[in-house]
């Protein structure tokens, strides 16, 4: 159950981050049309929904797992969002980024053994 809640937390907060990026990309296109056009976009609403669900999953997870064990696992969002940035938004990811992601994964694996 805890692993499922952690995965749901990661996916929902990751989706929320991606939806925020899509929000600002859309807002750039409709900037001249004002706030009404911005608020008609589905992206900010998806961001709010996903982040709200991520918060709910996180709170449920914290009922079952110590925060000192659970919180480092959220660092996997850096990995998830960086991969989405690279493959969905075609943002550059260089060797330095990849090295950082590997260090994050190694750190999470190291801390996960203690949990």
Curated annotation (Swiss-Prot):
| Cited InterPro entries | EamA_dom, Flippase_ArnE, Small_drug/metabolite_transptr
The GO biological-process annotations, alphabetized, read as: lipid A biosynthetic process; lipopolysaccharide biosynthetic process
Q: Name one GO molecular function term.
A: carbohydrate derivative transmembrane transporter activity
Tell me how this protein sits in the membrane. Answer: Multi-pass membrane protein
Pathway(s) of this molecule? Bacterial outer membrane biogenesis; lipopolysaccharide biosynthesis
Q: Which Pfam families match?
A: EamA
Domain spans labelled EamA: 46-113
Which keywords does the record carry? Cell inner membrane, Cell membrane, Lipid A biosynthesis, Lipid biosynthesis, Lipid metabolism, Lipopolysaccharide biosynthesis, Membrane, Transmembrane, Transmembrane helix, Transport
May I have one GO cellular component term?
plasma membrane
Q: Which domain of life is it from?
A: Bacteria
Membrane-traversing stretches: 42-62, 65-85, 93-112
Give the location in the cell.
Cell inner membrane
Q: Which family does it belong to?
A: Belongs to the ArnE family.
Task: Supply the PANTHER family for this chain.
Answer: 4-AMINO-4-DEOXY-L-ARABINOSE-PHOSPHOUNDECAPRENOL FLIPPASE SUBUNIT ARNE-RELATED, SMR FAMILY PROTON-DEPENDENT DRUG EFFLUX TRANSPORTER SUGE
HAMAP family listed in its UniProt record: Flippase_ArnE
Function per UniProt: Translocates 4-amino-4-deoxy-L-arabinose-phosphoundecaprenol (alpha-L-Ara4N-phosphoundecaprenol) from the cytoplasmic to the periplasmic side of the inner membrane.
Its quaternary organisation is: Heterodimer of ArnE and ArnF.
Name of the featured protein = Probable 4-amino-4-deoxy-L-arabinose-phosphoundecaprenol flippase subunit ArnE
Species for this entry: Pseudomonas paraeruginosa (strain DSM 24068 / PA7) (Pseudomonas aeruginosa (strain PA7))
